[in-house]
């Protein structure tokens, strides 16, 4: 019996993929599976996504891209975080597309002795993170166009404010992106497959789908914009087994610093999940867990290995071994948990680590 588990519902992943594929229409569907498929386990998740409609996969690092090939993913794979100093030749040999995110990246690929290299140019259209800056566009485009072994499959950019559908910055970025695309084609780059839509843009701006869309979070069943509902099914549940139930007297405290004290005689329970497992220490007093459909507030400081919940006078007889849902099925969803912690659901599903055991259902 595992004390701390993330349950991953692969049927939910399959369902979400089918929903997104239908929404994509004629556009290709790229599944972003970086960070171990948003902490859902890429070895199990990616094949399910591949089998239910994904045309391509997107990852951050070379290691993530190579892992997809190792587990048998045959679709196109795009890697967008790498450096010219890395050994990227193995990725080229395994037909992995590499993002050109700066002139230095373009130069490294142009100078690589390879018969054929597939690249996608990342444009910095306003996020001001990675991507080719406007003053660099012409030089990069002309250099890539002159390299016979380079195939530019397309261009992409990342939107800064897509989770705010009314924010005008998105349209400003699209104008810049289209300007870059026109300039690239003027220099002889066909750029047949282009994409700008992350999950929020994909779900709120169908006019921006272009030739491909690039959602990530939505595959895991979470909505990226408050108030949206697209019939997605959350795939992750984080749950633990209560390890101890004990009585506490009025005025007695619990956990380090005794920062919480019981107002009345009652019971507390220990849940074996701490900051070493991804539960942030600053979550003290901000959330509750669900046991048999009832909420119990977290009290006192979150420790490295455990936290405490108040059972009141324990009218429902919670005992050691009871299942405490931190978020997910039969409990608060990841978005609600994130709001209580003043963060986003993207971060919340990436948090369960440490001694957490992943189980697939």
From Swiss-Prot:
E.C. number(s) listed in UniProt: 5.1.1.1
Annotated binding of substrate, by residue: 129, 304
Domain of life: Bacteria
Keyword entries, A-Z: Isomerase, Pyridoxal phosphate
Catalyses which reaction(s): L-alanine = D-alanine
Functional pathway: Amino-acid biosynthesis; D-alanine biosynthesis; D-alanine from L-alanine: step 1/1
Cofactor(s) required for function per UniProt: pyridoxal 5'-phosphate
Example GO BP: D-alanine biosynthetic process
Active site per the UniProt annotation: 34 (proton acceptor), 256 (proton acceptor)
Keyword Lipid metabolism listed: no
UniProt-recorded Gene Ontology molecular function terms: alanine racemase activity; pyridoxal phosphate binding
CDD domains to which the protein is assigned, alphabetical: PLPDE_III_AR
CC annotations in GO: cytosol
Gene3D superfamilies the UniProt entry points to: Alanine racemase, Lyase, Ornithine Decarboxylase, Chain A, domain 1
UniProt enzyme class: isomerase
Modified-residue entries (N6-(pyridoxal phosphate)lysine), positions: 34
UniProt-listed HAMAP family: Ala_racemase
Family: Belongs to the alanine racemase family.
PANTHER family noted in UniProt: ALANINE RACEMASE, ALANINE RACEMASE, CATABOLIC-RELATED
Subunit structure comment from the entry: Homodimer.
Primary role: Catalyzes the interconversion of L-alanine and D-alanine. May also act on other amino acids.
Cross-referenced NCBIfam families: alr
Protein name as annotated: Alanine racemase
